[in-house]
UniProtKB/Swiss-Prot annotation:
This is Elongation factor 4. It catalyses: GTP + H2O = GDP + phosphate + H(+). Its EC number is 3.6.5.n1. It comes from Lactobacillus acidophilus (strain ATCC 700396 / NCK56 / N2 / NCFM). Its main location: membrane.
Length: 612
């Protein structure tokens, strides 16, 4: 092994992420870089080249971070190896951004020339600064008629404190400015500084399951080298494996003889169980292990919980296996078994937000061919019990009776909303409607304001983002972080069908909204549940108190059609007999609840509740 050659190779590596607010053109810039460096041929090139998940292409967003090795011949006559990592822009997937930054020395900070700095631009920049990365400002979409690159540079300097005087102006659509950007990567982003001669130390930043090769680990090599035949150890479990293949993504897998300190690539080692590795673990040399593991990642707790059940109970084991495989590729997903009297055996799943929940459900249905029922999402509540202990409630049906606890606390967030001056009024009105508490308002420039509210997380996760976009014509952007738990006047509302509580339909609401929400829920269920041969009573209740009710009338068979019209006694007798039969049927009949009903609570927006 020629160390001098390997060190020279290492000096020509550049590892960088592309970070930005959603829709500011990260994936388009990545496409142009792949095109200009001939990493993919013109025939193979397609939009969102690095978004290889079908769902990403359907939705037009990046969900998973993706890495690719790019070879670039610079103007100084030397060849460089770029490891480009594309990252998501949506707030739900910020954990993907933090993981990708840990594998880099630099970041391209992309800002839309027509929109300027947005909420996620700020959030992602702070992540990059925390990781001590070299940040290269990039002004994108300069081809748009509404583009104002100078204003975007001013905002970067004023709001982020970065020098934007030599920011690269590009158009991801036309390719203008991309050659200058490639040169900037060479000159401004430092080479990795890992020690090639030290024992192997590599960080697992992603992984996926392959039916033929087992678990494929995506790694950043911090120190040392790794090649096929080497014995490696995963430090968290102590388990040892023999490496069968190493390589890089370019953007399709390309085998290599060796990966060295600074490389970003993949390792396979006949790891058959998805439980044996975890994102954030450190890999080392089994014969000469490193003394200390790498710091890994801060585990981000779920924000939203929902029940997930197979439509056919026989698919329970398939769902469990699918969730385990998905968790390997989605470190933020959490799940544990749960049982519902209405839905049978399933799992209580934790997600980072509603988009994350939708994505997981769609991936399970598309990639694993499962039919699923999801219950309405809920946040984590804390019930302070009479004996002083705290019970964590992630399922509304688990909230104890009112006499058993002193108070219920719910999570609060600090919400930062960037909005044009013209829309400050509607935004403040929306926040107050969602039980928000005004904190402060900062004028960023003469056009935009940063409005800060303390708000219950439960109000944010449902339709707040959609309401915000519609009340500001799409111009507002949102970022939020959990600040802690507060005691509020919350109650559990049970939904009863023919006096039987349906656990999967229970929900928690603020007392001031409880009756309206219960009324809305019962009337919505009346529309969704098909008519039966017997009467169905739908009730909303807080404890023993019924606060709303709706009735689904039964089908009625004409039992009097044979009778002569002049025989009222016989007619009354037959109708009474029918009534007694229906009463018996109602007592023993099971009401079939359609899948739509379990998500009905999501459709209860403010206008519905207020009866507008």
């Amino acid at each position: 092994m020629d160390i001098k050659k390997l060190k020279d190779y290492q000096n020509h590596i550049r590892n960088f992420s592309i970070v930005a607010h959603i829709d500011h053109g990260k994936s388009t810039i990545a496409d142009r870089i792949l095109e200009l460096t001939d990493t993919v041929s013109e025939r193979q090139l397609k939009n969102q080249m690095l978004d290889d998940m079908p769902l990403e292409r359907q939705r037009g967003i990046t969900i998973k971070m993706n890495s690719v090795e790019v070879k670039y011949h610079a103007k100084n006559g030397e060849d460089y190896i770029f490891h480009l990592i594309d990252t998501p822009g949506h707030v739900d997937f910020s954990y993907e951004v933090s993981r990708s930054l840990a594998a880099c020395e630099g970041a391209l900070l992309v800002v839309d020339a027509s929109q300027g700095v947005q909420a996620q631009t700020l959030a992602n920049t702070y992540l990059a600064i925390d990781d001590d990365l070299e940040i290269v400002p990039v002004i994108n979409k300069i081809d748009l008629p509404s583009a104002d690159p100078e204003n975007a540079k001013e905002e970067i300097e004023e709001m982020l404190g970065l020098d934007a005087s030599d920011a690269v102006e590009v158009s991801g659509k036309t390719g203008q400015g991309i050659p200058e950007l490639l040169e900037k990567i060479v000159t401004d982003i430092p080479a990795p500084s890992g020690d090639i001669e030290a024992p192997l130390k590599a960080l697992i930043f992603d992984s996926k399951y392959d039916d033929y090769r087992g678990v494929v680990l995506s790694v950043r090599i911090e120190d040392g080298t790794v090649k096929p035949g080497d014995k490696i150890q995963i430090m968290n479990t102590g388990k040892e494996y023999e490496v069968t293949e190493v390589g890089v993504s370019s953007p399709h897998p390309v085998k290599k003889d060796i990966l060295i300190a600074g490389d970003v690539g993949y390792i396979t080692a006949n790891i058959k169980s998805v439980r044996e590795t975890r994102v954030g673990d450190t890999i080392t040399d089994a014969g000469h292990p490193t003394a200390e593991p790498l710091p890994g990642y801060r585990q981000i707790p779920p924000m939203v919980y929902s029940g997930m059940y197979p439509v056919d109970n026989r698919d329970y084991d398939d769902l469990k296996e699918a969730l385990q495989k998905l968790q390997l590729n989605d470190a933020a997903l959490e799940f544990e078994p749960e049982t519902s009297t209405a839905l049978g055996f399933g799992f209580r799943c934790g997600f980072l937000g509603l988009l994350h929940m939708d994505v997981v459900q769609e991936r399970l249905e598309q990639e694993f061919d499962l039919d699923l029922i999801m219950t309405a999402p809920s946040v984590d509540y804390h019930a302070i019990m009479n004996d002083g202990t705290t019970k964590v409630i992630d399922n509304p049906s688990d909230l104890p009776d009112a006499g058993e606890y002193k108070e219920v606390q719910e999570p609060y967030v600090k919400a930062e909303i960037m909005v044009p001056n013209d829309y400050v009024g509607p935004v403040m009105e929306l926040c107050q409607r969602k039980r928000g508490e005004f904190v402060t308002m900062d004028y960023l420039d003469k056009y935009r304001v940063n409005v800060i509210y303390n708000m219950p997380l439960a109000e944010i996760i449902f339709d707040f983002f959609d309401d915000l976009k519609s009340s500001t014509k799409g111009y507002a952007s949102l970022d939020y972080e959990i600040t802690g738990y507060r005691a509020t006047d919350l109650v559990k509302i049970d939904i009863l069908l023919n006096k039987e509580p349906i656990d999967a339909l229970s929900f928690i609401a603020h007392r001031s909204e409880a009756q309206d929400r219960a009324r809305q829920m019962t009337s919505m269920l009346k529309k969704l549940i098909p008519r039966q041969n017997f009467e169905v009573d739908i009730q909303g209740a807080i404890g023993a108190k019924i606060i709303s009710r709706a009735t689904i009338k039964p089908y009625r068979k004409d039992v009097t059609w044979k009778i002569h019209t002049g025989d009222p006694d016989r007619r009354a007798k037959l109708l009474e007999k029918q009534k007694r039969g229906k009463k018996r049927m109602k007592a023993v009949g099971r009401v079939e609840v359609p899948q739509d009903a379990f998500m009905a609570v999501l459709k209860m927006n403010d206008d519905d509740i207020k009866g507008k």
